């Protein structure tokens, strides 16, 4: 947790999307679990911290989805070729299975090509964030 840093404008982006009625989901590859760098409990602790900090500002993160797998990982139970590791759409599709979401109203913002590919594979819009204010980036997406 001590190494975690918020992306510029991230908190206010979460607040804006919450105020506009969006359900916010985080989908993240966590190959460090498969590599033995940290545990799933560590990932869950970080996610609880992030959600708690966001809530202090009035933002609500609906759910975190994470993939602990890596085909070439050093921890055997996580060293698998799964359907959830981005660019595969498994985590996004799981959110659609668990929540009543309209694909045409959903979008994903990610900082890597795999994020956008996962969004496209799931049938939603994906946007590549490459730095600067995430809030301004998101406002431009919402403007259409």
Residue ranges and their predicted role:
Residues 1, 33-34, 79:
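Short coil/turn segments at secondary-structure junctions
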Residues 1-12:
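Basic, amphipathic juxtamembrane/active-site segments
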Residues 10-47, 61-70, 119:
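Substrate-recognition element of Asp-dependent hydrolases with the DxDx(T/V) motif
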Residues 40-63, 72-108, 112-144:
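Asp-based, Mg2+/Mn2+-dependent phosphohydrolase catalytic module
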